[in-house]
Amino acid sequence: MSEPDGVLDIHAHVAPAGLITDLAAGRVRFLHVDVRRRDGSYTVAFRGGPPTRPLAAGLTDPGLRAAWLTEQGITRQVVSGWLDIFGYELPAGEGADWSVALTEAIAALTAADGRLIPLGTVPLQDPERAAAALHQRPVAQIPGVMIGTRAGGRELDDPAFTPFWEAADAAGAVVYLHPGSAGATPRYADFGLVNGLARLEDSTVTLARLLYAGVPARYPGAKLVVAHGGGALPYVLGRLVRNHLIDPGGTADPVESFARLHFDSVVFDPAVLEFLVAKAGPDRVMLGSDYPFPIGDLAPRSVVERAALPQEHRDQILGGNAARLFGSAAAAPSPPMPRPAPSGEAAR
């Protein structure tokens, strides 16, 4: 490709093994964080709630990640925490401390491999503390944060989140919006529909609310990136516009805020990627994999290279757009430190 900054995968997850093992061994303690061994891995539970699924090897094994990056011809990878361990269930103070511990652990592991770019976390259940955490991050090293679609029982368009959005706007921070499984009613219990559809519904509803509330347009300094190609949003935007025209006094123009969004390429189908590029613009789409999960695109360059797009647009998606959005953090990487050989397959 022609882009000097190489190929950048902006959508990948990690669970810092050092922090997890320290918690399991009692070397690090949080009152409401419970880490236990299960099926040769670990689970994490918050505030007495149900445990997560066992941590996938690809989340914790740096050797697997390093080998995969080389195999796929990916120069840099933006790594974010696994949403299941963000700890939004925790009390505000403990949640703030947990967010710091998780962000520092992510930053430490990326420092050991110059190809990795960290995104932090914030205690989104307390918007004031989330704003403070965003301001306190080392900007040159951590260009932004990943957040879920809701926290503390509130939607992201709730006025309570104003301090967070103001902080993101002022800091020019990347805010990567990632769904959970909050939309997974019993209707999604079969056929793998939690991953196949519920997460996309979660994103789409959150985005529709943000657009109608005018949040992206009101805070243009916040670089809002959306996972999984924006869910269904690009396809239903016309309907949202029609709904706005019926009630223009009660909703902001969704097109104005849609134009502020950035998207990853995790859509799998070249025709869908072509539609996304046509709808959002070639400067608004970036390569993503959702590594290490099977529902992700673990050969992410393929969909870009198969899409009927000009080579200039492919180059933008494969690296140019991300290099611009992530700024100095996406500069040419230093050589990675030696890694152990891969010990297994990445699996969710």
Language model features with spans:
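Mid-to-C-terminal alpha-helical segments outside catalytic/metal-binding sites
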Residues: 2-10, 17-76, 104, 108-111, ...
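Hydrophobic faces of well-ordered beta-strands that scaffold small-molecule active sites
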Residues: 8-10, 77-79, 117-120, 145-147, ...
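Catalytic metal-binding/acid-base residues of hydrolase active sites
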Residues: 13, 150-151, 180-181, 230, ...
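Active-site gating loops and adjacent loop-to-helix segments of metal-dependent hydrolytic enzymes
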Residues: 13-57, 183-201, 240-258
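Active-site gating/metal-coordination segments in enzymes
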Residues: 75-206, 346
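Active-site core of metal-dependent hydrolases
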Residues: 147, 192-204, 217-218, 224-230, ...
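Aromatic-lined glycan-binding groove of carbohydrate-active enzymes
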Residues: 211-214, 218-256
